[in-house]
Every structure is written in structure tokens, then in C-alpha cells.
């Protein structure tokens, strides 16, 4: 059994570690609430933009519009946009995206496509850089609570590659926020934009709520939103001109939403991981305290036996 000093040092170390993990859990919980505020502030613009596009879609055949972002090509070159965080200590959040990206990359290569990556986040960038994957652009050091400026950087790079002919299709791989204890890596086609996917019934928005002192999440369908545009609304510009302006905004908004969901997932994963670490540290400290008490009791008993033995020898 370890001596008393070693056990005391371990107990002190575990308790100090628990203070750190508990502080990180509280910070993550606070940032999750701030992530909610970002989503709520950006939602009115996103909703209005989707309704304008929906109104245009109902008046013209978007498939026949001469708009580059809508033009589907015979894909030969495909770009994967993978989103992780810049830091660790968030459970399997980063590893799950890296694994899914590797699998998708291998699937596409096996099917004969030329595949490249755009990385968002230091973890995914470092991983694939070290393994010499073809990376055409990388974004690190973005705000932990993503803004439209962050999304614009990514969407501009994606749009430039697509319009320049460097890629025929862009797929986005990120973590979908389900609730505070559950997230899911998902992938979706980002470009070419699908006009039928605008304001689809499956499009969900999430809102963080507090109920009975516990932080939770509510999801609602975008199709349930009210305030539709009036059917007699007149657009002065031609449909093609409007689409050339609005579709890049829609692309940026799609990227922003993915960044925000990914950030919320990272914060929730970190909060859960640090909560588990704090619980484990508490249990370990309790176990070490029991070991310390046993060792101390054994030492006292041994001293008593030595005293008794010495007294018996002198008698």
C-alpha cells in the first residue's frame, strides 16, 4: 500500500483537477446559453430570406433559371467541408467528425471521384494535414460563438471553388445539435443549391430553455413559422437578378447555421465531458480518502503493537 504522503498528494491532485473540470463545465454551460442568443438574433433574417426565395420559387421554374449556384453538373471533383472545434476536452465531438470525413473520403475515392477537403477547425485541419490529405482551404481560430463574418469566410471559399470549376459538388459534414446530451454527425450537399430544399418541412430550428432549473432544448419545424409573404408581392428586378443576389446570402446562412449547430454541439459535449470528469474525480477522491484512512489506521495499529511489544520485552 502506498505511504500516507503519496496518498495525500494524490488526493490533493485529484481535488485540484476537479476544480478545473468543474470550472470548465460552468464556462461551457454559460457559452451554450450565448450560443442560443446568436441563433435567435440571426433567425429573423434567415426566415425572411427563406420566405423570399420560397415566393420566387412559386412564380418561376428555378430549375431552368440561368443561375450558376443552381446548376447541377456531372460530378468528377467533389469537395468535403469538415467542421470541428479548435480545442479538445469535448468527448468524441472532434473524433466523430474526423472519422465520418475519412469514411466519406474513402467512399468517394473508391467510386472514382477526385476528392479534396476544406477544413474548419484546428483539430480536423491538423489531423488531415499530418496525413497529407488534399486540403484546398482551412479555417482556424474562428469565434467560439460563430458570427455571419465567420460564415462569410467559409461560404466565399466554397462558392469560389464551385463557380471557378475547381469542384462540381460540395458536401458539408458537421455535428447536428439534438440536445444537451446527444449530438449527431451529419452530412448534406451544400452546392449546387437545391431549390426544392428551401424552407423544407424537415428544416428544424432549436431553442435553449430552462425548466425547473435544468437547461434543455426545444426543436420546432421551420414550416410552422407564420408571416408568409403576400402572394401579390411585386419584385422590380428580374428573377435571375434576384437569385444572383439572394442565393449567395442563402448559402452563407446555411454555413452559419451549420457553424452554430456545430459550436452548440461542441459546448454541450464539453459540458458533458467535464461533468463526467468532475464526477469521476469526486469518486476517485472518495476512494483515495478511504485508502488514506485505512493506511493511517494500519500505521497507528502498527505503532501500538510496537509499543506493546517493546513493553513486553522490558518486563
From Swiss-Prot:
Keywords carried by this UniProt record: ATP synthesis, CF(1), Hydrogen ion transport, Ion transport, Membrane, Thylakoid, Transport
The encoding gene: atpG
Subcellular location: Cellular thylakoid membrane
Domain of life: Bacteria
Organism the protein comes from: Synechococcus sp. (strain RCC307)
Upper classification of the organism: Bacteria, Bacillati, Cyanobacteriota, Cyanophyceae, Synechococcales
Any Pfam family the entry gives: ATP-synt
PANTHER family: ATP SYNTHASE GAMMA CHAIN, ATP SYNTHASE GAMMA CHAIN, CHLOROPLASTIC
Functional description taken from the UniProt entry: Produces ATP from ADP in the presence of a proton gradient across the membrane. The gamma chain is believed to be important in regulating ATPase activity and the flow of protons through the CF(0) complex.
Keyword Transport: yes
Name by which UniProt lists this protein: ATP synthase gamma chain
